[in-house]
Amino acid sequence: MTDLWHHLAGAAGIQLTEQHHAQLHRYLDLLLKANETINLTRITDRTAAEIGHIGDALTLLPFLPKGSHGLADVGSGGGVPGIPLAIVRPDAQVILIESTQKKAAFLGKTIEALRLRNVQLFIDRAESAAQGPARESFDVVTARAVGAMNLLVEWCLPLVKVGGKLLAMKGAKVIEELADADKIIPKLGGGLPSIHRVNLPGTEHHVIVEIPKVSKTDAQYPRPPTIAKKRPLD
């Protein structure tokens, strides 16, 4: 999958080095080994993981700002897309937000093993993090397999600074999900979403939803943990 990685990075003007490759492969080693005892990913085949994890993460590169910026990966789980992006973009200051203790423990060990000095771990829910110092502090917030758009935007947009963006990695139901969220996004300070279709070998209906942050989020959002799931905004 070396050619695929080079192609995806090249689309953002990035030349992958031997060190990039070594760290990306080492990350996959750690992820797949830990997955034997912790439920981190449904992808267990190495080649599929090279596409579905590393390749998937690298599709976000063209949407990241040039130069140093702050990025939060909400519900980071096994570390995708946050860790691959941190490896390839060492000028990005990446925060992995994960509330599940076992997953957070894996992320902490992986950050240390890969010596990723530009990565920090927040063991917290996005709703709680967004009511603290992290509120509206990130240029980019990413989310992959975290929840439907009507929930995702309440959890994530309060973390994005005005002028920044939310990048949500979605699948076949994206149009339906956006229809459910179209009145919610402006309430949270979001602008008009853009849908970017991405082609990855062996995958279908892969899209990146880009939502700009155009105004501050009202202080009442996000609501306390679990409330969004029980009573989604409309």
Question: Model-found features: residue ranges?
Answer:
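Class I SAM-dependent transferase core
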Residues: 1-72, 102-122, 226
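Helix-to-beta-strand junctions that scaffold the AdoMet/dcAdoMet cofactor pocket
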Residues: 89, 160-162
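Short "lid" loop at the C-terminus of a central beta-strand within the Rossmann-like core
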Residues: 127, 148, 171-175, 199
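SAM/dcSAM-binding transferase cores
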Residues: 179-234
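Residue-level signal for inorganic ion chemistry
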Residues: 31, 85, 170, 211
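Short alpha-helix immediately C-terminal to the canonical SAM-binding loop
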Residues: 103-105, 174, 178
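Conserved beta-strand signature within the Rossmann-like core of class I S-adenosyl-L-methionine
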Residues: 163-173
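Conserved SAM/SAH cofactor-binding pocket of Class I
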Residues: 55-147, 153
